[in-house]
Amino acid sequence: MAAREQANSVRRSGFFNPFIGKRPFFRPGSGQTAETERPRPPQHSYCTEVGSFKFIAPRCLDEEAPADQRRGVHVGTLERPPKVYCDGSEYDVLNFASGGCWPRRIRVWNGQDFRGDGFNPRFERFHVYDIVETSESASHDDPSRFAELSRPSGSVVTLLGMSECGKRVAVHVYGVRHYFYMAKAEVDSACGITTEAELVRAMVDCAHSSALSAALGNGNGGKQSGGSGGGWWGGKHVSADCFKVETVCHTTLYYFGSKPALYYRVSASSSRLGGFICDNFHPEITKFEGSVDVTTRLLLDNENFTSFGWYRLRPGTHGERVQLRPVERHVTSSDVEINCTPDNLEPIPDEAAWPDYKLMCFDIECKAGTGNEMAFPVATNQEDLVIQISCLLYSLATQNHEHTLLFSLGSCDISEEYSFACVQRGEPRPTVLEFDSEYELLVAFLTFLKQYSPEFATGYNIVNFDWAYIVNKVTSVYNIKLDGYGKFNKGGLFKVWDIATNHFQKKSKVKINGLISLDMYSVATEKLKLPSYKLDAVVGDVLGEHKIDLPYKEIPSYYAGGPDRRGVIGEYCIQDSRLVGKLFFKYLPHLELSAVAKLARITLTRVIFDGQQIRVYTCLLKLARERNFILPDNRRRFDSQADAASETSELAMDSQSHAFDSTDEPDGVDGTPDAAGSGATSENGGGKPGVGRAVGYQGAKVLDPVSGFHVDPVVVFDFASLYPSIIQAHNLCFTTLALDEVDLAGLQPSVDYSTFEVGDQKLFFVHAHIRESLLGILLRDWLAMRKAVRARIPTSTPEEAVLLDKQQSAIKVICNSVYGFTGVANGLLPCLRIAATVTTIGRDMLLKTRDYVHSRWATRELLEDNFPGAIGFRNHKPYSVRVIYGDTDSVFIKFVGLTYEGVSELGDAMSRQISADLFRAPIKLECEKTFQRLLLITKKKYIGVINGGKMLMKGVDLVRKNNCSFINLYARHLVDLLLYDEDVATAAAEVTDVPPAEWVGRPLPSGFDKFGRVLVEAYNRITAPNLDVREFVMTAELSRSPESYTNKRLPHLTVYFKLAMRNEELPSVKERIPYVIVAQTEAAEREAGVVNSMRGTAQNPVVTKTARPQPKRKLLVSDLAEDPTYVSENDVPLNTDYYFSHLLGTISVTFKALFGNDVRTTENLLKRFIPETPHKTPTKTQALLERAGFEKLTPFTPEEESRRILHTVFCTLEAAPHQS
């Protein structure tokens, strides 16, 4: 202990507060100046030398100051380099040569070579994980072949990765040109030209025009996806050498009637120039593929090139060698940089191993600085500070936890107990880095990020909060440029922004060149179905662990409590990063996402943030190129910097991915919407961006369910991969669709093409022997690839099996995107006619299946003729068969007169017979499951039991995330009774067979007595004292910012505003807000008034002149919502009437199928079980009654009460009881 105290005293000696110290310090606006030399301009945009900076630090760190002087923050300017204190030593944050106090992988800093004399830059094989596109202008004295390819300016595609020998490398690929197409006849007519040379001159004139030249010089044309090294030289320098024009013959993708035609293929040396010309050269002329960036061109135009995987360097076509860049010309933080051309690269497609990439798992803690310290911090407020950042560093190759860093504003002592526990778990001891000011902490974090240079970063909600807070803070408060803190030293993309906001949710993206951000919050919301997605709830469900929580409102007091108390915050911060790291290696999201990137040939960042449309588009683009088709341009949609339109359109689709492999999801049903809005109908991407998923066709057919409780076996047939198989079987595609029979001249109906009635329109699709569907080819190849991958899994090592499983999952994801790709009006290549045809065929298949079953197996004799084995499966009931439900890709068939075991055994043969007799390959029905008992409620809502007693449910309230545990517990208990108890099941079947109105005047079957006892138990529990608030917590997602809601009178919004009113930590968008419903007390009424005023929904009661007292106005349920923590801490009474009514409502919606789907009748019948609340007679009145000779009644015993309830339920008089 003494040694520790001595170490602490040494550590504290370096801390400096400029407000009480004697070093040079200048307050803003004081008129003082510092006698310092002006620093030379930095060679790179990341900080390497800082002589003064804005000093902001909390006053609570002035531990010897009086208490009344320890609130708020110090703000000023400090004249000295940024410092960091670690283990009793002081370091200069930006002095690379001093060694530093955090791990570093970078070996070239500020143009200086720290690689060592023995460093060998040679390598042959290297792995790529990210790709960045830049522009470069070559100097006139550079004679290399690479300068010729970038003169006057050219695009460079940089492959970032690691060599097989462990060097961090950047391979700059020159000679990749941007190109697009224009119809020759249209161009010649518009420009009055006939030759390629004339077109070149016309484009040069376009670039030279005064207004456009200025725009070109300002970079308002084309696309920049990463760094922008080399600058830009303006439109005036554009010459004929910048362009290359060829006349080629192609066919446009849309419609069978399109014929091969001549097109000008215009290529430019840089994507900026090419994009500018595509946008501004005769905008009325239709362009093709102009929005395709040069990165995509590199990957698609070269065989087997991949966005994520291995390459080998080799001599070029004519023996050209790669060029090693000298250190002084490095533009990234890589160890080695190479110049090459595409022919110097040889992909290695079969190599699946990963190099030793590093993962940074981080978390930030913030604190409000002035006013109310309990308020939630805002990054743009200079007083709201980042006080701690935890960084845990892992090896992706070994999954080893290698380092733990804690950046702390002010002194911070991690307890010895916590450090020892880390060592005991096999984790490194935390290294604490302490800072005097927030600027120094943030600059140190960014410098560490640059110097350690991890390839991957993760955390929990880092996209919406951590990254966003850091970026906004350093740019708005400290004016730090971030373009040099990714892999590129200057001009790199380092940005967080919102990509879409619609009526459902808000989505953000973060793009940092050379750093892939994988947010585990997004992974959790996609993989799990939980009432809450707070980190504690997720790790509890996935890992079986629970975090030690530190409420936000306690952070200010802990932070002001000294180094030990700040250490508690540090342990909490480290704990969050550690748990997220465990989640990461549980789900391994990088493996699945990288497999998608490889298959779709797009970068990993685009896979994460740019939606599903781009995945199909690039695959279709490659196949179209091979088949001599060209794709119409959809500017501002393919571009990753302007995805808002297609992203917004995909929000609904992302959450409703179509069923592809039903074996992975036992109860999965194709998630296609049943109904469609009347959205945009144009098929060229027209319509306003950001207006949601606009479709203009009817959804899939649903055969109305025969609601009720079915105790005879019900077999469920599923169409395997329904929509992909329809596209394949019927050869559906852009290229096979004909809108007019004139285009089909010489072709025979049914033989050469099929006709479909879609709404009031006839659509024609030619068969594969006439023209093969490109979409069908993609699906066929992907399915074959997935089958081959899955076949390798059983014989692979565990490590290989994980990679293969992620690969087959990636193929499944892309296959499921194809139908949605055509059906989104604001997508990259919309064709609503294809999507409408798919759903039309799906409807017809359902109807054909129903009619086939009802005719082919109508009698027992017909069934046994088709399936002789059915003879042995008879039971005592008369035979019948009926399709009781059909939903998109599922058919429910009820058999009476056959045993459950028999139907289960015959199911596969039945599905095969239907597939063979009715459908084209690869469409096929599969026997998915057989229900022993099935409560079929309405469309998409059912509960049943299959073989082995497993319960399956879909769409019922019991599995909804927003129900409280009290309701879920009793609702589930009642469902268990219905499905597993013979007496209750028999009674339920009897109830279903009788018209529901009859049960109002007659007793329920006696088998329902167990059902009633559960309801009585629930009533007694809800009316008992000392309720556990946790059992009554409900949740709802904050899907968008509160001000974006049209209806603000929602329970979770009420709680949001109450938290704001009390200056509590506010939930983030997409976070689930917990709430309970409280009793209407005077306090609840007061707070409801305040909340309604805050959200602009206040209602002033109408005042009337009357002598009578006004009745108490009943508040809306939403006004009575309250934060569960506040209820527990303040003993606020719950609204028990609401909860029991909610329970009755929930189970009535579930069990209404027993009573003809009449909710009112169901609820009234269930209320028979509820004991009546006795009327309490006032004491004075009771005394008068006794004196008058009335006998005093004593309360019933519980046993008598139960007897009377059951008598009421099962011995009801024939006349209906009077309802008050």
From Swiss-Prot:
Keyword annotations for this protein, in alphabetical order, are: DNA replication, DNA-binding, DNA-directed DNA polymerase, Endonuclease, Host nucleus, Hydrolase, Multifunctional enzyme, Nuclease, Nucleotidyltransferase, Transferase, Viral DNA replication
E.C. number: 2.7.7.7, 3.1.26.4
Question: Single GO molecular-function term?
Answer: DNA binding
The catalysed reaction is: DNA(n) + a 2'-deoxyribonucleoside 5'-triphosphate = DNA(n+1) + diphosphate; Endonucleolytic cleavage to 5'-phosphomonoester
Domain of life, per UniProt, equals Viruses
Provide GO CC annotations from the record: host cell nucleus
Q: Where does it live in the cell?
A: Host nucleus
Family per similarity comment: Belongs to the DNA polymerase type-B family.
Q: What is this protein called?
A: DNA polymerase catalytic subunit
Q: Which organism is it from?
A: Equine herpesvirus 1 (strain Ab4p)
